[in-house]
Amino acid sequence: MKALHLSGTSFDVVNEYPRPEPLPGEVLIRVLRAGVCETDLQLIQGYMGFEGVLGHEFVGIAESGRFAGQRVVGEINCSCWKCDTCRSGLPTHCPNRTVLGILGHDGAFAEFIAVPEQNLHAVPESLSTDEAVFVEPVAAAYQILKQRLVERGQSVVVLGDGRL
């Protein structure tokens, strides 16, 4: 399969990259769209020393499992679900996690990606594929609101240099 592979600070389109073999509990996804994120650009500059296929914002078709044949998007953190952090309800902070296209797990800048089935969400027919690729960045912003309730009349400050 074709894939955009990062090694050090250089990346190449690889025409014969190995198609992922899903681990138990994972589903093979045929990627339809993948979005470029500021994190991808930082990884190309050497951030976190990632080597592999970039890309964590995606929409694709599930090849197997309960979503077989459906368009899906996926959460990027692949948690262990065994540690105290996961069991306490904070799997996105799992110290043993891999992260699609960022940390220890090939991402979506390829024809196929393997993703834990529990990370997948079906895309409703009312949402186009071009719109669905933005689910991950919108969900990342929304996650902040879930972690900290902001009530009417309170002030907040937003810091950071991300693209959202």
Describe the predicted segments one by one.
Residues 4, 27-28, 157:
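Conserved beta-strand elements of the Class I
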Residues 39-43:
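Cytochrome P450 core scaffold surrounding the K-helix E-X-X-R motif
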Residues 37, 164:
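Conserved Rossmann-like nucleotide-cofactor binding loop
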Residues 5-12:
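Extracellular beta-rich ligand/substrate-recognition surface
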